[in-house]
Amino acid sequence: MAPLRPFFILALVAWVSLADQESCKGRCTQGFMASKKCQCDELCTYYQSCCADYMEQCKPQVTRGDVFTMPEDDYWSYDYVEEPKNNTNTGVQPENTSPPGDLNPRTDGTLKPTAFLDPEEQPSTPAPKVEQQEEILRPDTTDQGTPEFPEEELCSGKPFDAFTDLKNGSLFAFRGQYCYELDETAVRPGYPKLIQDVWGIEGPIDAAFTRINCQGKTYLFKGSQYWRFEDGVLDPGYPRNISEGFSGIPDNVDAAFALPAHRYSGRERVYFFKGKQYWEYEFQQQPSQEECEGSSLSAVFEHFALLQRDSWENIFELLFWGRSSDGAREPQFISRNWHGVPGKVDAAMAGRIYVTGSLSHSAQAKKQKSKRRSRKRYRSRRGRGHRRSQSSNSRRSSRSIWFSLFSSEESGLGTYNNYDYDMDWLVPATCEPIQSVYFFSGDKYYRVNLRTRRVDSVNPPYPRSIAQYWLGCPTSEK
């Protein structure tokens, strides 16, 4: 029997090898499975964890994700006399409105280390009179003990301090003591609100950014400190000194924006701006997919990760990969590496990734022209606590609502939408993703192509009016 022992050993090794070669057969809609050695969920391409037969079994298409075709500030037509979206009111509106996305409401009106992103909910004990609450929220109050703030005028043209996307896709702008939430066309009802009521920090702040990973934590900077939030809740141990968390980054920064890692093995970056210089900082690690299970996935990150399915690896590496620096690099001059951007900026924000290309006339004919502004925000398709999987039919129907046909801003093509149309067609080979960065200075802003690091040459040219293109304010032109 001794001569047979090697055969048994070889057979055992072969069986173990086959067991390691897990398949995606029957798993394409089951989501992430921590117990498996390889994955078949829609994010496995980004995490480089797909099973060997993922492409064959699951047949992923980049068109099943949210695909934007134009940058945030482009219109179907440049109609400067369009009616504003009721944003001519210049006073603060302390009315009761629903919080955006899955942000948690505050239960205490006082400032505590843990801050929530909804100041509207009343304290449970004892409830004050409505008149008293209005006096607290109204910025022009003169009651003793209540700070006085100047009345905020939406279309005043004053510079903004910060812009950032939250993990649920909401876009927030900060100016002075106040913050705004922006929707697809203008400012959401109920804004502006005091930053202290919404974030638990007394404004003004210096800068803000949200990391583009599965957790999507938001960072606010003020003076020598910074605050970190997850799902609207301040993380324990914050605020912290900038020198502790971001070694090499100066205090009192002017602006900041974050970029994703080109893949899970890469590193996220954030750019800080102060005066005429900027600093590039690299995070040393990002959370794993398993660490993010059980919580809501960042919609901004999901949009980026789904684009990894297509053959754009080289472009993403060019955009988001850099040599390792272990923290902050030496400061550089803005004018040297960001061509066309003013020497000093007030705020900055990374725009959404959009895809340019062209369509045949027959494909365009199936769509109806839309005059809606193209600043559609990210839409999360997963709720907190729900398993991250859907059937192929439900996935297709839910995502098609937010899907746009490919177009080119340079060629003047607009965005077409039809919510009942089946979107299972392939991306044209000529399409490629473009990442924009927005720089805000005074009452104007600039859009920069991250790949060329130059201000986009479009019509109307940059700089453009922040009030008109981002706030929905009426134009002075007739």
From Swiss-Prot:
<dbReference type="GO" id="GO:0005518">
    <property type="term" value="F:collagen binding"/>
</dbReference>
<dbReference type="InterPro" id="IPR001212">
    <property type="entry name" value="Somatomedin_B_dom"/>
</dbReference>
<dbReference type="GO" id="GO:0042802">
    <property type="term" value="F:identical protein binding"/>
</dbReference>
<feature type="modified residue" description="Sulfotyrosine">
    <location>
        <position position="278"/>
    </location>
</feature>
<feature type="modified residue" description="Phosphoserine; by PKA">
    <location>
        <position position="398"/>
    </location>
</feature>
<dbReference type="GO" id="GO:0030247">
    <property type="term" value="F:polysaccharide binding"/>
</dbReference>
<feature type="modified residue" description="Sulfotyrosine">
    <location>
        <position position="281"/>
    </location>
</feature>
<dbReference type="GO" id="GO:0005615">
    <property type="term" value="C:extracellular space"/>
</dbReference>
<feature type="disulfide bond">
    <location>
        <begin position="24"/>
        <end position="28"/>
    </location>
</feature>
<feature type="compositionally biased region" description="Polar residues">
    <location>
        <begin position="86"/>
        <end position="99"/>
    </location>
</feature>
<dbReference type="GO" id="GO:0050840">
    <property type="term" value="F:extracellular matrix binding"/>
</dbReference>
<dbReference type="GO" id="GO:0048237">
    <property type="term" value="C:rough endoplasmic reticulum lumen"/>
</dbReference>
<dbReference type="GO" id="GO:0005178">
    <property type="term" value="F:integrin binding"/>
</dbReference>
<keyword id="KW-0358">Heparin-binding</keyword>
<feature type="region of interest" description="Heparin-binding">
    <location>
        <begin position="366"/>
        <end position="399"/>
    </location>
</feature>
<feature type="disulfide bond">
    <location>
        <begin position="28"/>
        <end position="58"/>
    </location>
</feature>
<feature type="repeat" description="Hemopexin 4">
    <location>
        <begin position="420"/>
        <end position="473"/>
    </location>
</feature>
<feature type="modified residue" description="Sulfotyrosine">
    <location>
        <position position="78"/>
    </location>
</feature>
<dbReference type="GO" id="GO:0051258">
    <property type="term" value="P:protein polymerization"/>
</dbReference>
<dbReference type="GO" id="GO:0030155">
    <property type="term" value="P:regulation of cell adhesion"/>
</dbReference>
<keyword id="KW-0732">Signal</keyword>
<dbReference type="GO" id="GO:0098637">
    <property type="term" value="C:protein complex involved in cell-matrix adhesion"/>
</dbReference>
<feature type="modified residue" description="Phosphoserine">
    <location>
        <position position="362"/>
    </location>
</feature>
<dbReference type="GO" id="GO:0035987">
    <property type="term" value="P:endodermal cell differentiation"/>
</dbReference>
<feature type="modified residue" description="Phosphoserine">
    <location>
        <position position="311"/>
    </location>
</feature>
<dbReference type="GO" id="GO:0045861">
    <property type="term" value="P:negative regulation of proteolysis"/>
</dbReference>
<feature type="signal peptide">
    <location>
        <begin position="1"/>
        <end position="19"/>
    </location>
</feature>
<feature type="modified residue" description="Sulfotyrosine">
    <location>
        <position position="416"/>
    </location>
</feature>
<dbReference type="GO" id="GO:0014911">
    <property type="term" value="P:positive regulation of smooth muscle cell migration"/>
</dbReference>
<dbReference type="InterPro" id="IPR036024">
    <property type="entry name" value="Somatomedin_B-like_dom_sf"/>
</dbReference>
<dbReference type="GO" id="GO:0016477">
    <property type="term" value="P:cell migration"/>
</dbReference>
<dbReference type="GO" id="GO:0033627">
    <property type="term" value="P:cell adhesion mediated by integrin"/>
</dbReference>
<feature type="repeat" description="Hemopexin 2">
    <location>
        <begin position="202"/>
        <end position="249"/>
    </location>
</feature>
<dbReference type="GO" id="GO:0010811">
    <property type="term" value="P:positive regulation of cell-substrate adhesion"/>
</dbReference>
<feature type="glycosylation site" description="N-linked (GlcNAc...) asparagine">
    <location>
        <position position="86"/>
    </location>
</feature>
<dbReference type="GO" id="GO:0061302">
    <property type="term" value="P:smooth muscle cell-matrix adhesion"/>
</dbReference>
<dbReference type="GO" id="GO:0031012">
    <property type="term" value="C:extracellular matrix"/>
</dbReference>
<feature type="disulfide bond">
    <location>
        <begin position="24"/>
        <end position="40"/>
    </location>
</feature>
<dbReference type="GO" id="GO:1904090">
    <property type="term" value="C:peptidase inhibitor complex"/>
</dbReference>
<feature type="repeat" description="Hemopexin 1">
    <location>
        <begin position="157"/>
        <end position="201"/>
    </location>
</feature>
<feature type="glycosylation site" description="N-linked (GlcNAc...) asparagine">
    <location>
        <position position="241"/>
    </location>
</feature>
<dbReference type="InterPro" id="IPR018487">
    <property type="entry name" value="Hemopexin-like_repeat"/>
</dbReference>
